[in-house]
Amino acid sequence: MEEKAKMRRLSTWKLKLRMFLATVLLFGLIYAILMVVGSILGLGGPLFYALLGFGVIFLQYLISPKIVELTMNVHYVSEAEAPRLHAMVDELARRAGIPKPMVGIAEIALPNAFAFGRTKADGRVCVTRGILNLLDEEELRAVLGHEISHIKHSDMIVMTLVSAVPLICYYIFWSTVFSRDDEANLVGIAALIAYFIGQLIVLFISRTREYYADQGSVEIGGQPHKLASALYKLVLRLSPVQQGRPETGRGCQGLLPE
C-alpha cells in the first residue's frame, strides 16, 4: 500500500511538473520572440507591453484546449466506448440548456474531473481513470454536473478575461524595470501593485465561480448529498493518511472519538 501511495504521489508530481513546464516553455518562447521583434522594431514602452499582454491572452485562449489535451493525456471517447458516461453528460447538458460537450478520459491515476474549451459550443468534459475507479455512478453524475455548470456559466472565458488584467500589469511593470525615467518607474511601481491586487481578485473570482458551479450541480443534478460524498472521497483519497504519510494527517485527531 505504501508503494502504491509513493507511485501515486510521483504520478501527481510528474503531472503538475509537465503542465507547468509546458506552459512556461510555450509562453516563454512566445514572449521571447515578441521581445526580439519589439526590440528590432524599436518598440518597448508600456503601450507595447500592454498590447503584448492582450496578444498573449488571445493566443492562450486559442490554444489552451490543445495544451490541456496534451499535458493531461486526454483522449475522447465515443458513445460506444463509454455509454454510461455519455448518457450522464448528455442528460446534464440538456438540463443545463447547453450543447453536449465532448467527452474525454485522461489515463492518469489522480482522481479529477475538469471542463475546458473556448465557448459553450466548444466545451469539453474530461474525467480521469482515477475518479472513474473511485466514485459511484451518482457521485460521478454530481461531479459532472459541477463541470458542466462551468461550461454553462462560461467560466473558461470569464477566467481568461479577468486573468488578462494582472498579466498586462506585469508586462507594463517589466517594461519599466531598466528605465532611468522617474515617471516610468512610478508607472512600473503602480503596475506591480496593480498586478498583486489583480491576482488576489482573480483568486477570489475563481473561488466564487467554484461555488456557482457547486450550486449549478445541485440545480441540474438535484443531489447535493452525492456531490458532498464525492468531495469527501476525493479529499480522503488525496489526504496524507491515504498517501502513506499518517504522521502528517493527525491535525484533526482530537475531533475523533477515542
UniProtKB/Swiss-Prot annotation:
GO-annotated molecular function: metalloendopeptidase activity; zinc ion binding
Binding site for Zn(2+): H146, H150, E210
GO BP, sorted A to Z: proteolysis
Keywords linked to the UniProt accession: Cell membrane, Hydrolase, Membrane, Metal-binding, Metalloprotease, Protease, Transmembrane, Transmembrane helix, Zinc
Cofactor: Zn(2+)
Protein EC: 3.4.24.-
Active site: E147
Family matches, as Gene3D superfamilies: Metalloproteases ('zincins'), catalytic domain
Protein name: Protease HtpX homolog
Organism: Methanothermobacter thermautotrophicus (strain ATCC 29096 / DSM 1053 / JCM 10044 / NBRC 100330 / Delta H) (Methanobacterium thermoautotrophicum)
Protein encoded by which gene: htpX
